[in-house]
Regions:
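Gly/Ser/Thr-rich phosphate-binding loop
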Residues: 250, 273-277, 289-374, 386
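AMP-binding/adenylate-forming catalytic core of the ANL superfamily
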Residues: 113, 130-132, 357, 409, ...
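Conserved AMP-binding/adenylate-forming
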Residues: 70-116, 462
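Conserved ATP/PPi-binding loop(s) of AMP-dependent carboxylate-activating enzymes
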Residues: 380-384, 393-426, 461-463
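Conserved AMP-binding/adenylation subdomain of ANL enzymes
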Residues: 207-225, 235-275, 284-301, 305-306, ...
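ANL superfamily adenylate-forming
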Residues: 49-53, 129, 135-181, 195-196, ...
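Conserved pre-ATP/AMP-binding loop-to-beta segment of ANL
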Residues: 40-42, 169-188, 195, 219-225
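Conserved structural elements of the adenylate-forming
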Residues: 61-69, 180, 185, 199-222, ...
Length: 560
């Protein structure tokens, strides 16, 4: 085995990855493809207004080398951190892999953050520079000024921006020496309960997620075209839209626009991905669009936008999107309600493969699989990972017993940035405490109960907010729901539901206010389908739910 080699043995499950003494991930994910004859193949396609823009593997390798040289020429050195506030575009690939190849540590963060939070991350990360898309200057520039760390701003523009330095740089760049266990990049957690946390990852972490999940579970290969509505700046999107397609020599489809039913359906129709990665909120909104088209064309009946590419014209000229290129639909970020699974399959003929991952684990470690799906379940353990459920007494729970999910695998972070007290509570003896409550059934399927701090004790019995939310979402009037505990006049905790409707409420239904009528209907709906103690005592109709940039509901804000 050469010092830079990586060998993969797929004769067993999970596949075995064996590294040489040195391994710089950029060489494997970028340079390897040119060496293996894929230089002329399209690595990246851009959707939306940039739909004609493509980048081949040879052009990717050149762009990565130029970006790495430009960063070194601007004074960054191996080990320095480079914060990235960059939209989903080829430059994200160039600077992420260019930094890694040069020995610099890229740190992608959400471009939806405000200056205050960006300033915190600039200071917390100790980054030497921030590379950013020009449309985010309104937050990045004041964040840099407020942080007062001396970090340099590098705007992705020509004529005075960092793209001038890239254009002038040499494309050939030798990979900086690195070992498999060296830190390659950082991410920041989405912060469901407070300030984001810096999460370092090693060179070996990305191959583990790609081989165990992308190949081992999804079966991705060189012919696949991966499109992720979830963006590159967090772990789920980083895998879906970058490391997965580059691992197998496939094609990444990028869309810098905010994902909506209109933009995602347009991208699927025009660029024909084979694998689509979304989140439950977006699947719900897409279904709402499909339902509207179906209602406008009642004579057509059956599925709309099905895997076979059927087209249905509505009375207003609208038609169902052609989803015929898709063979895989994946969901993560929040648990997928079983009714969403059933409705999506009925409407499109496609199953949604629900799974759970985390920033700390880099991607999905429990998942449903093609042809092996249990609606309402998160799935079974991805080969290459271990999972256990631990009760409040610290003892591993048996089948049917609830507790906190802990996982272990080759992609989990070695620790946190500047958070030793959190690290000691979260990573114990190699086990990562996820903070999620789960039940595992006798067949090994894992069933989500909610975040540990979101569980509600009603009448002395723990109940899962997810079960109540899933029941509410079975009602045709409900688009989204979030349930928290609230004290009543007697100081007893009962469920409170915050509900986003599919259509605005009318003022009245007969002589009764519409809100009161629908509240009574939803309460009765829950009482019919849940144990009686679990029904929501209050229902609040809201325009939207508070969420992180990754789509996770921030229930702590609803409890405030």
């Amino acid at each position: 085995m050469s010092p830079t080699a990586l060998t993969i043995d797929r004769s067993s499950s999970p596949a075995r990855l064996a590294y040489g003494e040195a391994f710089n991930a950029a060489s494997w994910y970028v340079d390897r493809h040119v060496a293996e004859g894929r230089g002329g193949k399209v690595a990246i396609e851009q959707a939306g207004e940039q739909a004609s823009k493509t980048v081949t593997y040879a052009e990717l390798a050149e762009g990565v080398g130029q970006a790495g040289h430009a960063l070194l020429g601007l004074g960054l050195a191996p080990g320095d951190r480079l914060l990235m506030v960059v939209k989903d575009c080829p430059e994200f690939f160039f600077f992420f892999w260019g930094a890694i190849k040069a020995g610099i540590v890229p740190v992608p963060v959400s471009y939806l953050m405000r200056a205050r939070d960006l300033g915190f991350i600039i200071a917390d990360s100790g980054c030497r520079a921030v590379v950013y898309s020009p449309e985010f200057a309104g937050e990045v520039v004041p964040a840099l000024a407020g942080a007062r760390t001396g970090a340099r701003g590098l705007v992705l523009e020509a004529e005075g921006g960092v793209l001038d330095d890239v254009a002038a740089a040499r494309p050939a760049l030798d990979a900086a020496p690195a070992r498999p266990d060296d830190i390659a990049f950082w991410l920041y957690s989405s912060g469901t309960t407070g300030r984001p946390k810096g999460v370092p990852h090693r060179h070996r972490d990305m191959p583990a997620t790609c081989e165990h999940y992308a190949v081992g579970v999804l079966g991705l290969g060189e012919d696949d075209r991966c499109y992720s509505a979830a963006k590159l700046f967090f772990a789920y999107g980083l895998g879906n839209a970058m490391t997965f397609p580059l691992w197998v020599g496939g094609t990444a489809i990028l869309d810098e626009r905010r994902p909506t039913p209109a933009t995602t359906f347009e991208t699927i129709e025009t660029l024909r991905p084979t694998a689509y990665f979304g989140v439950p909120t977006l699947y719900a909104a897409q279904l709402q669009t499909l339902d509207q088209v179906r209602d406008q064309a009642p004579a057509a009946g059956g599925r709309v936008g099905a895997g076979g590419g059927e087209r249905v014209a509505g009375s207003s000229g609208e038609r169902a999107p052609d989803l015929g290129s898709l063979r895989l639909c994946v969901s993560a970020g929040e648990a997928l309600p079983p009714d969403l699974f059933r409705r999506w399959k009925a409407a499109t003929g496609l199953q949604i493969l629900d799974g759970i991952g985390s920033t700390e684990a880099l991607h999905i470690f429990i998942s449903n699989a093609p042809g092996d799906v249990k609606p309402g379940s998160t799935g079974r353990v991805v080969p290459g990972y271990e999972a256990r459920i631990v009760g409040e007494d610290g003892v591993e729970a048996g089948p049917g017993e609830a507790g906190q999910l802990e996982i272990r695998g080759d992609s989990t972070t070695p620790g946190y940035r500047n958070r030793p007290e959190l690290e000691g509570r979260t990573i114990v003896d190699g086990w990562l405490r996820t903070g999620d409550q789960y039940v595992r059934d006798a067949e090994g399927w894992f069933h989500y109960q909610g975040r540990a701090d979101d569980m509600i004790k009603v009448g002395g019995i723990w109940c899962s907010p997810f079960d109540i939310e899933a029941r509410l979402m079975e009602h045709p009037a409900v688009l989204e729901a979030a349930v928290v505990g609230r004290e009543n006049d007697h100081g007893l905790v009962k469920p409170e539901a915050h509900v986003v409707l599919t259509e605005p409420l009318r003022e009245t239904v007969g002589a009764e206010p519409a809100a009161d009528a629908l509240t009574a209907e939803l309460v009765a709906h829950c009482q019919e389908g849940l144990p009686r103690y679990m029904y929501p005592r209050w229902i609040r109709f809201v325009a939207e739910l508070p969420k992180t940039a990754t789509g996770k509901i921030q229930r702590f804000r609803l409890r405030a």
